[in-house]
Every structure is written in structure tokens, then in C-alpha cells.
């Protein structure tokens, strides 16, 4: 009558052999999120500055973006990834640092695309800061 052992319900990660993929870099003023997917958009690995333990204003630094890109690249290299297209979205400071970190991790960057959404005079922007 001992307590029943809880079964491990977590699914094991299957190693996929994928040659090329897409790195989606979302760089805001507060954080940088790097997601590496296959060409169909299925996520292989992801990382962000906040997930690595950077908090507050340190989350928005280029160094935090570099570390996030390195962590995501390591996870995708385990799946056999070799070449990448990079799509960058947002105005943050970690854009260039994340791209350089992906190249330094051993991934070949074939294209860099800026997909930052630009409004055709849509929503009213937030009020200007007075510091």
C-alpha cells in the first residue's frame, strides 16, 4: 500500500536531422527572444535573455542577447542544423549581437531579413517619455 510512483509523463526529445532552418530574433527594448525553427516553422530550440537569468535593465543589453543566441544555437546544433536564415523583428539593442553570436556558434547564416512591422498609421503610439 505504498504511495504509487508517479510515472514520467514528459515526452523525450527526438533528435531530428535537419540541415537548414530559420532563426527568429525578436528584439524589444526590454528583452531579446531567439527561436530557431525548421523551414516549416516547427521550433527546434529557443532562448531569451530573461530565461537565462538576466533581470531588469540587464535583460535588454547586447551581451544578454548574445548569450540567448548562443544557448539557442547549441540546442539546434544537437538536431543537426548547419545553415540558417535569420529574421530580425523589433527595435532593440540585441539585434546585431544575436546575429554575430549565431555565426560564432558555428552556424552558417545564408540570409538576414528584417521583418519589423511598420504601421501605415495604425494605432496611436504610447506617449513620449520625459526624463
From Swiss-Prot:
InterPro entries: Ribosomal_uS11, Ribosomal_uS11_bac-type, Ribosomal_uS11_CS, Ribosomal_uS11_sf. GO terms for molecular function: rRNA binding; structural constituent of ribosome. One of its GO terms (biological process) is translation. The keyword rRNA-binding applies. Part of the 30S ribosomal subunit. Interacts with proteins S7 and S18. Binds to IF-3. This is Small ribosomal subunit protein uS11. Belongs to the universal ribosomal protein uS11 family. Pfam families: Ribosomal_S11. It comes from the Bacteria. Disulfide bonds: none annotated. One of its GO terms (cellular component) is ribonucleoprotein complex. The gene is rpsK. Keywords: Ribonucleoprotein, Ribosomal protein, RNA-binding, rRNA-binding. Located on the platform of the 30S subunit, it bridges several disparate RNA helices of the 16S rRNA. Forms part of the Shine-Dalgarno cleft in the 70S ribosome. It comes from Bacillus velezensis (strain DSM 23117 / BGSC 10A6 / LMG 26770 / FZB42) (Bacillus amyloliquefaciens subsp. plantarum). NCBIfam families: PRK05309.1 (NF003698), uS11_bact (TIGR03632).
